[in-house]
From Swiss-Prot:
NCBIfam families: murB, PRK13905.1. One of its GO terms (biological process) is peptidoglycan biosynthetic process. It holds the Pfam family FAD_binding_4. This is UDP-N-acetylenolpyruvoylglucosamine reductase. Belongs to the MurB family. It comes from the Bacteria. GO terms for cellular component: cytosol. It catalyses: UDP-N-acetyl-alpha-D-muramate + NADP(+) = UDP-N-acetyl-3-O-(1-carboxyvinyl)-alpha-D-glucosamine + NADPH + H(+). Its EC number is 1.3.1.98. Keywords: Cell cycle, Cell division, Cell shape, Cell wall biogenesis/degradation, Cytoplasm, FAD, Flavoprotein, NADP, Oxidoreductase, Peptidoglycan synthesis.
Length: 311
């Protein structure tokens, strides 16, 4: 157990003991963490992350909780929250600096207001800049790494600035999973007033499409599974279509349900547990494997599960 007195020598932010993580999850699911830390700023975050590394104590970093499922039993590691504190944005010409806790949608609008295009393709994609970078978020044929100039991380207790060509990015993953992303600089495209209006209209259309096809009115964490890779020259298949073909839309387990709007979403109907969600995940994986011979891979991250959970 970390000594609070030792922690206070390096950390200026908020400290909560035995705090619920459900409020920090887009699923509104999760048990308690032994200790939850909210840094005051980026320097505070760097200090506390280095502190845990030097003490060889495990820790978990959370952004907006939009791509995670947290165990009902909570976590014994310290949890560091970046949302609400690392939210600085600086726009200089076509270069956009954003800290990890910045909401991706707010950044998209802010960039368009400065007549910079590129982020409108991610309209409606939930989460923070940091989370989007770690998982190489994508939508409508585009990925966030198309726009990256550099990424600032804490790696093995040291602060590093990594250029785009120093990072391995693939479909919905990067080699940054063991690092803590603190900030990034994006290189966007200057656009004319006419193009700006077109981009805002494109953003409106994409948001409307999401409202019509995704269960945005209920707590969820976005796509549960990655879309499987192309097979035998076929185009990429969609996980949601495979799950729907297995007749699983609307199937419930406890307080969780495979969405009747989009089968690659699981929603919290009000009293869902992580165990409920896991049961639906395993059901979908099993049914798709038996019918199509395809192993679905999780897009979300599982936090706090001590027993082996197949990913």
């Amino acid at each position: 157990m970390i000594s609070i007195a030792d922690l206070r020598e390096v950390f200026r932010g908020d400290v909560k003991i035995s705090a619920s993580l459900a409020e920090h999850s887009a699923f509104k699911i999760g048990g308690k963490a032994d200790i939850v830390l909210k840094p005051l700023d980026k320097a505070d975050a760097i200090n506390v992350i280095k502190f845990f590394h030097e003490k060889q104590k495990p820790h978990i970093v959370l952004g907006r909780g939009s791509n995670v499922l947290i165990s009902d039993d909570g976590v014994r590691e310290a949890v560091i929250l970046l949302s609400g504190c690392l939210e600085k944005v600086d726009i200089n010409g076509e270069l956009v600096y954003a800290e990890a806790g910045v909401d991706l949608q707010k950044l998209a609008v802010q960039s368009l207001n400065h007549r910079l295009g590129g982020l409108e393709a991610f309209s409606g994609v939930p989460g923070s800049v940091g989370g989007a970078i770690v998982m190489n978020a994508g939508a409508h044929g585009h990925e966030i790494f198309e726009l990256i100039d550099w990424v600032e991380v804490v790696r093995d207790g040291s602060l590093k600035k990594l250029r785009k060509n120093e990072i391995k990015a693939r479909y919905r993953e990067t080699d940054l999973a063991q690092d803590t992303v603190l900030s990034a600089r994006l290189k966007l495209k200057p656009i004319s007033e006419k193009e700006q209006a077109e981009c805002f209209e494109r953003r409106r259309e994409l948001m409307e499409k999401r409202r019509n096809s995704q269960p945005l009115s209920l707590p969820n964490v976005g796509s549960i599974f990655k879309n499987p890779p192309p097979y035998n020259g076929e185009s990429r298949q969609f996980a949601g279509q495979l799950i729907e073909a297995c007749g699983l839309k609307g199937v419930r387990e406890g307080g969780a349900m495979i969405s009747d709007k989009h089968a690659n979403f699981i929603v919290n109907l009000g009293n869902a547990t992580a165990s409920d969600v896991l049961a639906l995940i395993e059901l979908a994986k099993t049914k798709v494997r038996l019918r199509f011979g395809i192993d679905l891979e999780l897009e979300i991250k599982l936090i706090g599960f001590t027993e082996h959970v197949e990913k």
